[in-house]
A protein has these predicted regions:
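CoA-thioester-processing core
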Residues: 86, 90, 100, 106-159, ...
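Conserved CoA-thioester-binding segment of acyl-CoA-metabolizing enzymes
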Residues: 1-52, 88
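Hydrophobic/aromatic residues within transmembrane alpha-helices
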Residues: 15, 51, 64, 112-114, ...
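Glycine- (often His-adjacent) and acidic-residue-rich active-site loop
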Residues: 53-88, 135
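Short glycine-rich anion-binding loops that position phosphate/pyrophosphate groups of nucleotides
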Residues: 20, 55-57, 103-104
Length: 184
């Protein structure tokens, strides 16, 4: 079970990340996400896509680190490539893509949001790229997209130091376009 859902409401599609407790990415969910993006690209009637996390604490905490526990370099490479393919497909989506960040958006969670056209964060959200703290680097275009949005100074702080930012600071630095109250 991939624990990722695609639903349609009129001309809007919703992808919900639902992998408790933290809505993490697995290889299977990345592959399912890519297939959903292929399906969405075949639907010209879909003009908008909202990506959201199930629950109220996590938008997406990034990769499920259990995938890397055995130290298999080939598997890590396969996962990194899957991240890249999935989020590049999102970045190329023909409609408007919106990340509805309802909680923690870490690592691959922030990277999926960065691939969206618009990012809206609830006020309790916390955003970051903590990969460096576990010996990794963002692998899905996040380094480039983050730098484009916030400039090299903030990008380096977040990428190299793993600095996390609140929704308010993310708005002030241009990482998100709007901050809303919880549940909106």
């Amino acid at each position: 079970m991939t624990r990722i859902r695609l639903e349609y409401h009129g001309h809007v599609a919703y992808i919900t990340l639902d992998h408790p407790p933290a809505n993490t990415w697995t290889l299977a969910s990345l592959q399912a996400f890519l297939q959903m993006m292929v399906e969405l690209d075949s639907r010209p009637d879909v003009v908008a896509l909202v990506i959201r996390g199930a629950g109220d604490k996590f938008f997406c905490a990034g990769a499920d680190l259990k995938m890397f526990a055995d130290g298999n370099v080939e598997h890590a490479r396969e996962v990194a490539e899957a991240f890249g393919r999935a989020f590049e497909a999102l970045a190329r989506f023909h409609g408007v893509s919106i990340a509805a960040i309802n909680g923690f958006a870490m690592g691959g969670g922030l990277e999926v949001a960065l691939a969206c056209d618009i990012r809206i964060a609830e006020q309790q959200a916390l955003l970051g790229l903590p990969e460096a703290s576990v010996g990794l680097l963002p692998c899905a275009g996040g380094t480039q997209r983050l730098t484009e949005l916030v400039g090299p100074g903030w990008a380096k702080r977040m990428i190299l130091c793993g600095e996390k930012v609140s929704a308010t600071l993310a708005y002030e630095m241009g990482l998100v376009e709007e901050v809303v109250t919880e549940g909106h």
